[in-house]
Amino acid sequence: MNKIYYLKYCHITKSLIAVSELARRVTCKSHRRLSRRVILTSVAALSLSSAWPALSATVSAEIPYQIFRDFAENKGQFTPGTTNISIYDKQGNLVGKLDKAPMADFSSATITTGSLPPGDHTLYSPQYVVTAKHVSGSDTMSFGYAKNTYTAVGTNNNSGLDIKTRRLSKLVTEVAPAEVSDIGAVSGAYQAGGRFTEFYRLGGGMQYVKDKNGNRTQVYTNGGFLVGGTVSALNSYNNGQMITAQTGDIFNPANGPLANYLNMGDSGSPLFAYDSLQKKWVLIGVLSSGTNYGNNWVVTTQDFLGQQPQNDFDKTIAYTSGEGVLQWKYDAANGTGTLTQGNTTWDMHGKKGNDLNAGKNLLFTGNNGEVVLQNSVNQGAGYLQFAGDYRVSALNGQTWMGGGIITDKGTHVLWQVNGVAGDNLHKTGEGTLTVNGTGVNAGGLKVGDGTVILNQQADADGKVQAFSSVGIASGRPTVVLSDSQQVNPDNISWGYRGGRLELNGNNLTFTRLQAADYGAIITNNSEKKSTVTLDLQTLKASDINVPVNTVSIFGGRGAPGDLYYDSSTKQYFILKASSYSPFFSDLNNSSVWQNVGKDRNKAIDTVKQQKIEASSQPYMYHGQLNGNMDVNIPQLSGKDVLALDGSVNLPEGSITKKSGTLIFQGHPVIHAGTTTSSSQSDWETRQFTLEKLKLDAATFHLSRNGKMQGDINATNGSTVILGSSRVFTDRSDGTGNAVFSVEGSATATTVGDQSDYSGNVTLENKSSLQIMERFTGGIEAYDSTVSVTSQNAVFDRVGSFVNSSLTLGKGAKLTAQSGIFSTGAVDVKENASLTLTGMPSAQKQGYYSPVISTTEGINLEDNASFSVKNMGYLSSDIHAGTTAATINLGDSDADAGKTDSPLFSSLMKGYNAVLRGSITGAQSTVNMINALWYSDGKSEAGALKAKGSRIELGDGKHFATLQVKELSADNTTFLMHTNNSRADQLNVTDKLSGSNNSVLVDFLNKPASEMSVTLITAPKGSDEKTFTAGTQQIGFSNVTPVISTEKTDDATKWVLTGYQTTADAGASKAAKDFMASGYKSFLTEVNNLNKRMGDLRDTQGDAGVWARIMNGTGSADGDYSDNYTHVQIGVDRKHELDGVDLFTGALLTYTDSNASSHAFSGKNKSVGGGLYASALFNSGAYFDLIGKYLHHDNQHTANFASLGTKDYSSHSWYAGAEVGYRYHLTKESWVEPQIELVYGSVSGKAFSWEDRGMALSMKDKDYNPLIGRTGVDVGRAFSGDDWKITARAGLGYQFDLLANGETVLQDASGEKRFEGEKDSRMLMTVGMNAEIKDNMRLGLELEKSAFGKYNVDNAINANFRYVF
């Protein structure tokens, strides 16, 4: 762009025009054509507000103009890295897709360039920019946000091409430099079908749109802004140094869906290409010129772009280890210095006078280098770059100023030099910088890459400050705090794209948060938990610095609230917009400026007051809170409201809010040039994950696009609103200026934009919860209220309501999967829906575990719907009043409602859903499919439709009535109770239909031989085959009622006249198996009875102590199985007699066993003791005797005849004798035939109970088992100097000599007696005993049996003996 040198008055337009120095002669005749290189701006005639006379892009009028703006600023849908972006026209038609490359990052282009258009310079190195050579007029430029201003201090012009590079005064920390293509000026390198698959550009200046008819309309930029778009493949000329594209035809698909034609006003703006080989975007050119058909760019080559940075370096400083430190001396007057190590000296150059560009860069190589400043250094624009590890210190408090520090990847620099007040140390590079100076560092820090560790040390007075302020930007850097005193937290700010503040286990308190965008991150990765306190406060006048700017004749940009001085009128103005027009044209526009008079002090006070008022508005934090920390938010000054529209990731941390309001919300998508609004439709979803949110007399809102995972604990009148419409937006969002919060209301229009909560909410002491949008979790409410208006609420955890209300508002939908427990009633309002189910299986699709719910009532209003299905069990009355409510019990979906839970039979009785309670609703509709309804009291329904279900009237204590206007029943069972004179009643008043329904009757006392009790009454003419008598098992019998049909003038009745019973073999067998469980326990003890004596024959010794542990499993028919653990401890003594060794001893025993079968399950604990003796004759014969007593504590749960769980005690005793003979085949091997007899006693047991009103009893008497065993063992001994091992195997036959007692069963059909059965089995054992040294014995044995009704499946026992 041309530099403006003077303004000339035009008599035709009667206004000033800006004239370039390149115009040889400029007149203002309307017919005179201006030179291509002359750019004129007529402010009055064209009503332009831009500060430069520039023409820029012409784009399609068919596509929303905002898309081109968003594209250029990486806003809206054009976030860097986004793929497959669809472009639509104004009518919503798809124009095309950006699918050849991920979205480029344009942040390296300037966002402002002083009085020049934005985008005409591009950062390609941390301190260097490139533009067109003919572009001039401003030395200041900004990156990321407008306030991040840098000054160009040096230029390198290309002698033959329209391109130049410029050096900045500091390293840029806000953005990453663009990468430059390594192809460079090669003819044909950028043509179609080559390595580069996509071309994007951006720029600023005057803008136009053109429709398909060729009509062009100007877009007024009001200070200038960026637009961008797609460019076709490029052709080369001038030996590849120039590239061109036919961009003039913006409707040619070859130019891409966002084609744009550029004019001279956009000179210097960048052109990017996607390198498909290296998978990255690279800078390939800057705009130079244009024709009527297209545009021309100068190719950016690495050779030329590298010239200026190379020329700005002094000689490389190569540190040599072992030759001492580098002594750095500097002469500020001459701007020169030296670095000396031993006999080697390197010259350096710093700021000379006011010339920052005189300062040269220094590159330090070598490793473990040391530099000591002998003098304070002002290096001007020169920066320090470290390619190795270094330590830089000051001899005696010397300071350093310059362009900044670059630490290369993998390097670590220990920086022990303080800075200067008013200057910031700029740090880039992927390496680490540890700040380790002493005392108070008055300088600031701006970090854009790598890691900075703040570890400043206290001075003699205990004062410490690593920096006066810390700015974190670009999204790349991390700042680590070694302690909490390094920097005032209020002076930490996060700029463009932010970065990480690593707390490192330290605690911080913020009274203000300066976070420009979502890139701001406060994190703690230390194992030591940090606490962050957000004690946000209103600004104080003393904290506010008000710089006074000068109104520029060329217009400019600023931040709303900035103070300006107009020298021509000597008045002060406060800027209300983000930019202002040139030539003072809008100085009287009250929407742009606020006139605050001529008094400087009063003007400053006005600005301060406005900033104070703004800071008292609700607070907002756009950034992130991550890691191992807790966050505390006390009562805040001002309006005590904090809105978080960033994110929270504290999986093991909590956030605590005391009073006031806390809001978690999504974030409105930022669009270029527009202010975010609560009413806009596009929002970004934000995630808030934490262990717990604690509210104390506070209000919490989870608003649109907020997704929260974590528990909430609300107490002392707190309010929780999940799905709130209350949101806050930031008027400064996307500008980098101070947050200016604006309250609004926003309701999601799609389910995906609704708030989404997952967790458990606990309410206490008059707190309240409103569920208005997506909810998944549980609730515990104590003396509180809960309302649900959401149509997508799921309780997948328990819902518990103690002295608390649960209300489903109009149209709400709630599904409870883990049960609802309420001491009060649940209200379901008009058109609302409440569904109770079991817990879905995480492993099996369509499977559920049964879940019980209980309330004091379910109240249904008009058109409300209530369902229990998929293993849901509800104990509650349902009240529908006179409303047309719908009640659904069960589910017809064959693929859902399955279960493999043992509760399916015991609790659910094999049905999909269970209701225990009455239904009252004369106009209600009840639908039952595969459901069970225990209807007690008086129930009433308008219509009842039942399929494959069961309805049990009454509870066996009080008679119940079910009255239905219309009953349709198929394959359904109805169960009623009678006392022989009265019975439960089913009354159908209007219509009866259906078939294959059975009626069962439970008798509350012994049935009479003759009776006549009405069970069912239906309208006259009803089909008498609708109901038939059914048979059910009660006790140990099958009972069938005798039902006759009576027809009267107005009704058809089903009348009970008697009953028939037959014995049920299955129930009797289940009872017999249950009673026989004691025998199996006896048998387990028998198998363990004589183990000790067998050990004595293998390992003889003297007096000693021993211990044994045995674990085994057994099984029998009837699906019986058991497992047991048996422990014995004992002591015995050897008595040496003539021809015989007699062992006598005592033992204590404990057995823990569990058993189950199709009839019952249970557990037994047995404890006892005994005495034994074993005689081992020298001839090889032996004789063993043992007696033992056991006490048993038993708990069994039966699943037959409603026996339930029984706890009882029993006892048994055992007397055993065994005789055998050990024949030695050799000295080491032997054969041992055996015979054993065990006699015992097992105590009897008796049970009495009722099943469906029928009295039952079950008992067996004490009985005396007699068990014999014969067998043979073989064995062999192996020995060494101090050890001996005896291995053996055995085969035996065990048999009952007496039957195992008698079982007596009694029910209404009479007495049934069952004699015990005998059993026998083959026993197989293998084992070994080991003698270790002289006093230790170890043994191990495996046992199994076969061919018995009861068998030992596997048993293993181990024993240990210590000989005295």
Swiss-Prot record:
Residues 1098-1364 form the Autotransporter domain. It is an enzyme of class 3 (hydrolase). GO terms for cellular component: cell outer membrane; cell surface; extracellular region; periplasmic space. SUPFAM superfamilies: Autotransporter, Pectin lyase-like, Trypsin-like serine proteases. It comes from the Bacteria. Coiled coil: none annotated. Residues 1-56 form the signal peptide. The keyword Membrane applies. Optimum temperature is 37 degrees Celsius. Disruption phenotype: Mutants exhibit an attenuated virulence in the rabbit ligated ileal loop model. NCBIfam families: autotrans_barl. Major protein secreted in laboratory media showing proteolytic activity. May be involved in invasion and destruction of host intestinal epithelium. Secretion across inner membrane is dependent on the SecA and SecYEG apparatus. However, intracellular polar localization precedes secretion and is independent of SecA. This is Serine protease SepA autotransporter.
